């Protein structure tokens, strides 16, 4: 066997992100010293991004099965039964590191990559969502990152013809050196037309389709598995470049071929490119794979096998076809003006063999690359319990506080962002951004899918386990609030350096909380992603890690899209009720505490999962019975902010003259106690009666009407609230 470069030094190994111990393991697995091609392949497959070597042990604790689950983690995306022979297919992934280095392309290719994960399974993508985290609004780089990321998401999603229907955006100094871009795609497929990635059939042709391979994105997976230093800007060549028009052609070509029975297995080329797609297909099928690198379509001259295998050029797929179907498949891809090349064959060797110019340049047993990749039980320490907050004095009037909060970075309107996204393409969007969850009709039916992405990082910092539970619970509430039954979830776990025991403790705690909530709320994790090393080395040698950010994406089902509810008050005279516990006025880790009192401390609010489930079941039943006019979950900013958002959405004021006298007024209105909904109804007697029968607490708060929000006789006009609410992002982006 020839070696593309036999001079493997300690520096070469380190530059590939491998430890000396890992390099020794590679030599033992091969029984020899690897050449550069093989080293690069091991580097990519053993990167944190591909192998999950620090989190895999703990991810096994998550619930992944259920009566509704057709396919859980391990494939390109999760698959959930939605009835009538149809399935929802969805996943969320991160593109954090690339989006900090080159925000437009990083975010755009994040969207492209998650789209491919979904349509690879045979689904037509119907919706995109995103969860974004940026640094302090005062940081000089923040406007640049916001502008680039939003433009990248919109530019790619709009061109490819998939609506961007929801998401969330937060700002915090902990993200100054590492912004987060988590992208989620939801698709719909027929349950008898779902495609998987396990290769089979020795001798079957392996086909490369899509765009040509270039040098963009080489070592992208390795770069995404390390923290940043001062050289972050120099890593631009590791960021992929996307072409949404090619992606659109690829979607249509793949779905057209999928209508036949020509495909044995299919895998998109995502992180680690051709390396990961080839290894995953062969290892899942327990077969071997042989590739002729001379046949790989390249857009740049003189590309080597090392570059071809590690390139992360976008809009590419790998397929195993049934023998004799090559011409049929080629005709389809040529019609769509895409590359099509037979680059290899399935073997029974359980090795990955690469040839180039007549020589073997790689021969690796597949087991060490995939199933036997490193899995670490890293040392961890539990996050210390936060100190209880105690009483916090009021500061200013309730209404002045409300005006400040609705205009604050984490609660201000996101209109500037979502107006750059096409959220109606496809003509099936029922609820656009701005509510609790997006709602998209299942084309040609009365059914609809509801979807939301959620996490509260400040809670996770204070208590990772409780924060993990709350992320799932809030996603559950948001989906419930539009009338849908939550079915399943996907996660995107964003943390700092797992080699630091305190960070590993955050990971362990969050996963434990997520698992507990998913089991209690019957929202199994069916797909997901882990993004670690989200921290930046400071001038003094210390590291700034992001807040622990375990994002949860959920999907729910409405049997009839016309039954969905919104947050907007509909008419004057609707009675306003709080459904769920009255709350304890929990101000620890709240937006009020940060924005009004200037403090970030205290315990995270606790989540009662049994009560969460019972209250959610009640809310859905009331929506189904037509008892509720508007529904909104109470989360960031507490009851008063939820009330203001409902009033602004419907352009109808509200008067509330009730609060628990045992709780300070500001704590009552701005406390972030969990498991609660704000609703309006024109059938209050029946609502209260049903709640009593179900054992669900309800509290009458007031009535809709007028052009102001009135809290205990303190009034603020909708005009003043709206002016504050709409100002933040346009002013930031001037």
Curated annotation (Swiss-Prot):
Pathway membership, UniProt: Purine metabolism; IMP biosynthesis via de novo pathway; 5-amino-1-(5-phospho-D-ribosyl)imidazole from N(2)-formyl-N(1)-(5-phospho-D-ribosyl)glycinamide: step 1/2
Any single Gene Ontology cellular-component annotation: cytoplasm
Lineage: Bacteria, Pseudomonadati, Pseudomonadota, Alphaproteobacteria, Sphingomonadales
Oligomeric and partner information: Monomer. Part of the FGAM synthase complex composed of 1 PurL, 1 PurQ and 2 PurS subunits.
Example of a GO MF term: ATP binding
Binding residues annotated for ATP, in chain numbering: 52, 91, 491, 528
Highest taxon listed in the record's lineage: Bacteria
Similarity comment: family membership: Belongs to the FGAMS family.
Substrates-to-products reaction catalysed: N(2)-formyl-N(1)-(5-phospho-beta-D-ribosyl)glycinamide + L-glutamine + ATP + H2O = 2-formamido-N(1)-(5-O-phospho-beta-D-ribosyl)acetamidine + L-glutamate + ADP + phosphate + H(+)
NCBIfam families: FGAM_synth_II (TIGR01736), PRK01213.1 (NF002290)
Annotated active site: 49, 95 (proton acceptor)
Annotated InterPro entries: PRibForGlyAmidine_synth_PurL, PurL_linker, PurM-like_C_dom, PurM-like_C_sf, PurM-like_N, PurM-like_N_sf
Gene name, Swiss-Prot/TrEMBL: purL
Task of the protein: Part of the phosphoribosylformylglycinamidine synthase complex involved in the purines biosynthetic pathway. Catalyzes the ATP-dependent conversion of formylglycinamide ribonucleotide (FGAR) and glutamine to yield formylglycinamidine ribonucleotide (FGAM) and glutamate. The FGAM synthase complex is composed of three subunits. PurQ produces an ammonia molecule by converting glutamine to glutamate. PurL transfers the ammonia molecule to FGAR to form FGAM in an ATP-dependent manner.
Residues bound to Mg(2+) 1: 93, 529
Pfam (any one): AIRS
Protein name: Phosphoribosylformylglycinamidine synthase subunit PurL
Residues reported to bind Mg(2+) 2: 117, 268
EC number(s) reported in the record: 6.3.5.3
EC class (word): ligase
Compartment(s) of residence: Cytoplasm
């Amino acid at each position: 066997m020839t070696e593309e470069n036999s001079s493997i030094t300690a520096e070469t190994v380190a530059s590939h992100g491998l430890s000396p111990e890992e390099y020794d393991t590679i030599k033992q697995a091969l029984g020899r010293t690897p050449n550069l091609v093989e080293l690069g392949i091991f580097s990519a497959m053993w990167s944190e991004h591909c192998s999950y070597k620090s989190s895999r042990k703990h991810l096994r604790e998550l619930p992944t099965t259920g009566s509704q689950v057709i396919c859980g983690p391990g494939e390109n995306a999760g698959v959930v039964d939605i009835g009538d022979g149809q399935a929802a297919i969805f996943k969320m992934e991160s593109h954090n590191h690339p989006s900090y280095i080159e925000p437009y392309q990083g975010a755009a290719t994040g969207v492209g990559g998650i789209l491919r994960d979904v349509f690879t399974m045979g689904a037509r993508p119907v919706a995109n969502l995103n969860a974004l985290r940026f640094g302090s609004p005062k940081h000089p780089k923040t406007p640049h990152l916001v502008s680039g990321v939003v433009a990248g998401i919109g530019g790619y999603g709009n061109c490819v013809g998939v609506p961007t229907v929801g998401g969330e955006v937060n700002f915090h100094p902990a993200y100054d050196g590492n912004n987060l871009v988590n992208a989620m795609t939801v698709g719909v497929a027929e349950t008898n037309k779902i495609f998987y990635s396990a290769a089979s059939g020795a001798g079957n042709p392996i086909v490369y389709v899509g765009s040509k391979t270039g040098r963009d994105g080489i070592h992208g997976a390795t770069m995404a598995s390390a923290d940043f230093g001062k050289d972050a800007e120099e890593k631009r060549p590791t960021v992929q470049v996307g072409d949404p028009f090619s992606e659109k052609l690829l979607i249509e070509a793949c779905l057209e071929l999928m209508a036949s029975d020509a495909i044995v297995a299919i895998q998109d080329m995502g992180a680690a490119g051709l390396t990961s797609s080839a290894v995953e297909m062969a290892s899942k099928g327990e077969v071997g794979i042989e590739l002729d690198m001379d046949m790989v379509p390249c857009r740049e001259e003189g590309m080597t096998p090392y570059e071809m295998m590690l390139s992360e050029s976008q809009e590419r797929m790998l397929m195993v076809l049934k023998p004799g179907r090559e011409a049929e498949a080629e005709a389809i891809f040529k019609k769509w003006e895409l590359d099509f090349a037979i680059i290899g064959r399935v073997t029974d060797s359980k090795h990955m063999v690469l040839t180039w110019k007549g020589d073997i340049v790689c021969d690796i047993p597949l087991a060490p690359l995939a199933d036997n990749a490193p899995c670490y039980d890293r040392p961890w320490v539990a996050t210390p319990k936060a100190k209880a907050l105690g009483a916090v004095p009021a500061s200013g009037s309730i209404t002045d506080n409300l005006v400040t909060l609705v205009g604050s970075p984490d609660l201000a309107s996101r209109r500037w962002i979502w107006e750059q996204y096409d959220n109606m393409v496809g003509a099936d969007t029922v609820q656009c951004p701005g509510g609790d969850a997006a709602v998209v009709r299942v084309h040609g039916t009365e059914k609809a899918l509801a979807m939301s992405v959620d996490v509260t990082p400040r809670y996770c910092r204070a208590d990772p386990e409780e924060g993990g539970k709350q992320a799932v619970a809030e996603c559950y509430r948001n989906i419930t609030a539009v009338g849908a039954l939550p079915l399943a979830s996907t996660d995107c776990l964003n943390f700092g350096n797992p080699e630091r025991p305190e960070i590993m403790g955050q990971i362990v705690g969050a996963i434990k909380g997520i698992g507990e909530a998913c089991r209690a709320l019957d929202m199994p994790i069916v797909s997901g992603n882990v993004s670690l090393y989200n921290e930046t080395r400071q001038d003094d040698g210390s590291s700034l890690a992001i807040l622990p950010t375990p994002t949860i994406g959920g999907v729910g089902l409405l049997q009839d899209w016309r039954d969905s509810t919104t947050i907007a008050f509909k008419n004057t005279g609707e009675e306003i009720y709080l459904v769920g516990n009255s709350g304890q006025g929990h101000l620890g880790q709240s937006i009020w505490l940060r924005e009004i009192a200037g403090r970030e401390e205290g315990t995270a609010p606790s989540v009662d999962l049994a009560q969460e489930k019972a209250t959610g079941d009640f809310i859905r039943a009331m929506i189904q019975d037509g008892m509720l006019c508007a529904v909104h979950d109470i989360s960031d900013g507490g009851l008063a902010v939820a009330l203001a958002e409902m009033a602004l959405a419907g352009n109808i004021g509200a008067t509330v003259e009730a609060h628990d006298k045992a709780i300070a007024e500001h704590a009552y209105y701005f406390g972030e106690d969990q498991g609660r909904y704000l609703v309006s109804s024109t059938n209050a007697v029946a609502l209260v009666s049903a709640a009593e029968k179900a054992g669900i607490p309800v509290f009458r708060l007031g009535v809709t009407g007028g052009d102001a929000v009135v809290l205990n006789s303190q009034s603020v006009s909708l005009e003043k609230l709206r002016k504050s609410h709409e100002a933040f992002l346009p002013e930031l982006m001037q």
